[in-house]
Amino acid sequence: MCSQLWFLTDRRIREDYPQVQILRALRQRCSEQDVRFRAVLMDQIAVTIVGGHLGLQLNQKALTTFPDVVLVRVPTPSVQSDSDITVLRHLEKLGCRLVNRPQSILNCINKFWTFQELAGHGVPMPDTFSYGGHEDFSKMIDEAEPLGYPVVVKSTRGHRGKAVFLARDKHHLSDICHLIRHDVPYLFQKYVKESHGKDIRVVVVGGQVIGSMLRCSTDGRMQSNCSLGGVGVKCPLTEQGKQLAIQVSNILGMDFCGIDLLIMDDGSFVVCEANANVGFLAFDQACNLDVGGIIADYTMSLLPNRQTGKMAVLPGLSSPREKNEPDGCASAQGVAESVYTINSGSTSSESEPELGEIRDSSASTMGAPPSMLPEPGYNINNRIASELKLK
């Protein structure tokens, strides 16, 4: 019987760059490898239990067979456990292999839940406080006093650097309390001064680091997100950094994810966040990779009678220019060429038609395996100071 693969996403984000790239890559690979492919929107699905048996309806039609693998891309900050996760759990109960799994997505939709999962595993992370009630922010102003000032304040459901504040003192915290929405809790986190305005985004697929990008703020703010106007440049990662990112991915049960690492003065790292629905427009550009294609290759490897998940070779991309460059940090000129400023809400320049059944696709995707990332010894903070002038 022919294998079946679904790409499941949300109507609100279906035309964003990551979804368009993954969709094209999956369509091409499924067409070439005789795999039945279907692109599905979350609101097209109805889950059923009839006669004590689980069932599934798609566009009001009952299905008699179900996909072997489902690649999931849902807007993580707005994922609802009573709706979206219900559908994902149902698919999993039907025997579908989800990428990422429902529990893995839940581990990342709330920033404090992420730290709860990582706690007890020796993962370096900032001291963090949070609370249960929606109206308890003001109470936490005193409770979080041991964290000192300035203190980082984040919405547990924030994304893309939004709803993040650096409070100078208790009075500033009180002002923030009156300005924010209280529909979700906030967390209070110890400020990592040495990583102000910079971090490293690491993308992990199938338990392997496929690339890393240094992100830097250009306006002095604490957040370095490219969606807020920050810049990103390809950055070699030490073995310690790679192993930390892989450890976090494994603890959270992720098939693919983005891990954000804060940079300490001694060259070590502290985990800032994990992203189950990682965006990769800036990452693709800065690192000259095809993350959508890499995720598609990994997903295909999970189909029956294929590799069982672990990719033997990282299926990333590297240009001829990259292959001819020496190992180590890029020159100042190379850094300038690799830095991109990404505006919030950027999408692909080509709009994708309504998601539906697979059709022949003329879109081509690249697939040459890259060399492993170099691991030279270097001081990343000095690099930032001398080349990006941001320290």
From Swiss-Prot:
Signal peptide: none annotated. It catalyses: N-acetyl-L-aspartate + L-glutamate + ATP = N-acetyl-L-aspartyl-L-glutamate + ADP + phosphate + H(+); N-acetyl-L-aspartate + 2 L-glutamate + 2 ATP = N-acetyl-L-aspartyl-L-glutamyl-L-glutamate + 2 ADP + 2 phosphate + 2 H(+). Its cofactor is Mg(2+); Mn(2+). Mg(2+) 2 binds at residues 273, 275. One of its GO terms (cellular component) is cytosol. Its main location: cytoplasm. It is an enzyme of class 6 (ligase). GO terms for molecular function: ATP binding; metal ion binding; N-acetyl-L-aspartate-L-glutamate ligase activity. Mn(2+) 1 binds at residues 260, 273. Residues 341-379 are annotated as: Disordered. Residues 341-350 have a biased composition (Polar residues). Keywords: ATP-binding, Cytoplasm, Ligase, Magnesium, Manganese, Metal-binding, Nucleotide-binding, Phosphoprotein. It is found in: Cytoplasm. Mg(2+) 1 binds at residues 260, 273. InterPro entries: ATP-grasp, ATP-grasp_RimK-type, ATP_grasp_subdomain_1, Rp_bS6_RimK/Lys_biosynth_LsyX. One of its GO terms (biological process) is glutamine family amino acid metabolic process. Pfam families: RimK (PF08443). N-acetyl-L-aspartyl-L-glutamate (NAAG) is the most abundant dipeptide present in vertebrate central nervous system (CNS). Belongs to the RimK family. Catalyzes the synthesis of N-acetyl-L-aspartyl-L-glutamate (NAAG) and N-acetyl-L-aspartyl-L-glutamyl-L-glutamate. This is N-acetylaspartylglutamate synthase A. It comes from Homo sapiens (Human).
